[in-house]
Amino acid sequence: MSEGNAAGEPSAPGGPRPLLSGARGLIGRRPAPPLTPGRLPSIRSRDLTLGGVKKKTFTPNIISRKIKEEPKEEVTVKKEKRERDRDRQRDSHGRGRGRPEVIQSHSIFEQGPAEMMKKKGNWDKTVDMSDVGPSHIINIKKEKRETDEETKQILRMLEKDDFIDDPGLRNDIRNMPVQLPLAHSGWLFKEENEETDVKPRLAGPKEEDMEVDMPAVKVKEEPRDEDEEAKMKAPLRAARKIPGLPKDVSVAELLRELSLTQEEELLFLQLPDSLPGQPPTQDIKPIKTEVQSEDGQMVVIKQEKDREARLAENTCTLADLTEGQVGKLLIRKSGKVQLLLGKVTLDVTMGTTCSFLQELVSVGLGDSRTGDMTVLGHIKHKLVCSPNFESLLDHRHR
């Protein structure tokens, strides 16, 4: 670019620049443009230091007071609620919504006592893993799924009913019935042994024996009979006897033992409600009832009993049987026992054993509501008689 002189004529290139009287050169700044005649310079000069270094101004450092702000709990709670709502909205949309999630928690004592694990450092230095902290990788044990056959086998085992596995049904020896006198039941008082243990005296300081003149008296012992010695030893043996659990015997064995022993024993025999036999004859009279008719006259109507009532009266019970022999007991070779009542056969089986005392008592009541009770004996065994359906069907077809 060529610059003009004060007269406005262009100067030759390389010529000397004219010096202005009012201008002063500043280091690092370009000279102001020459003043043209007829135009005044602007009051506010333009900032021509665009490419230069700005002048630094001093500003004092004021230390601000720090105020500890309390954590805002409400904001965090609101944020958590918003996040939960978003997660619920995400889970509720799309396929597979409502899937159960497994939350696995871990602690520092979950793996139990174990040796301290050591990890090698960069410079062959052992570092304890306890300082590092528990690992966040947890091995979740996968449960083995059962197959259809295994589940069916478990159901079969649960549905079994061919065994008794209830410890409460077993008879306890401590709950045995008490029978008087105690010699029959086996529970007797424990007698202390009268024989004293003779211990040798320890050797102590010698004492002077006192001389006492005692008259020497000798008693002649007579020899005892063997029967007396056996009687003396018998109660001691009976006192040490402890009753055992009742033995499970069949009906055939029980009847054989009763036939061989000389002692008499009472048996509890359970029979059906209706027994084969001739019911007692009763005069059936019709029931007369008086009914008032519309005309005001009394009419007598005869009513007969229903069929069910007549059948109930025609049944034979144990009270209707006559005294004496009722039936016969048959013991088969197989061990099966049957009771024959006329043409009807009843199967005889053992009843459930009771762990409490059962006694047969005869009660006699008088006219003045007073009476006597007599204990006839102790009942140990129970027999149940049930009808044999095979013989009933055979008799029906004939």
Swiss-Prot record:
This is DNA-directed RNA polymerase III subunit RPC4. Transmembrane segments: none annotated. GO terms for cellular component: RNA polymerase III complex. The modification N-acetylserine is found at residue 2. The keyword Nucleus applies. The modification Phosphoserine is found at residue 42. Its main location: nucleus. It is found in: Nucleus. DNA-dependent RNA polymerase catalyzes the transcription of DNA into RNA using the four ribonucleoside triphosphates as substrates. Specific peripheric component of RNA polymerase III (Pol III) which synthesizes small non-coding RNAs including 5S rRNA, snRNAs, tRNAs and miRNAs from at least 500 distinct genomic loci. Enables recruitment of Pol III at transcription initiation site and drives transcription initiation from both type 2 and type 3 DNA promoters. Required for efficient transcription termination and reinitiation. Residues 66-100 have a biased composition (Basic and acidic residues). There is a cross-link at residues 68, 78, 141, 152, 160, 190, 199, 206, 220, 285, 302 (Glycyl lysine isopeptide (Lys-Gly) (interchain with G-Cter in SUMO2)). It comes from Bos taurus (Bovine). Signal peptide: none annotated. Belongs to the eukaryotic RPC4/POLR3D RNA polymerase subunit family. Component of the RNA polymerase III complex consisting of 17 subunits: a ten-subunit horseshoe-shaped catalytic core composed of POLR3A/RPC1, POLR3B/RPC2, POLR1C/RPAC1, POLR1D/RPAC2, POLR3K/RPC10, POLR2E/RPABC1, POLR2F/RPABC2, POLR2H/RPABC3, POLR2K/RPABC4 and POLR2L/RPABC5; a mobile stalk composed of two subunits POLR3H/RPC8 and CRCP/RPC9, protruding from the core and functioning primarily in transcription initiation; and additional subunits homologous to general transcription factors of the RNA polymerase II machinery, POLR3C/RPC3-POLR3F/RPC6-POLR3G/RPC7 heterotrimer required for transcription initiation and POLR3D/RPC4-POLR3E/RPC5 heterodimer involved in both transcription initiation and termination. It holds the Pfam family RNA_pol_Rpc4. GO terms for molecular function: DNA binding. The modification Omega-N-methylarginine is found at residues 95, 97, 99. Sumoylation on Lys-141 can serve as a signal to mark misfolded Pol III for proteasomal degradation. InterPro entries: RPC4. Residues 1-105 are annotated as: Disordered. GO terms for biological process: defense response to virus; innate immune response; positive regulation of innate immune response; positive regulation of interferon-beta production; tRNA transcription by RNA polymerase III. The keyword Oxidoreductase does not apply. Keywords: Acetylation, Antiviral defense, DNA-directed RNA polymerase, Immunity, Innate immunity, Isopeptide bond, Methylation, Nucleus, Phosphoprotein, Transcription, Ubl conjugation.
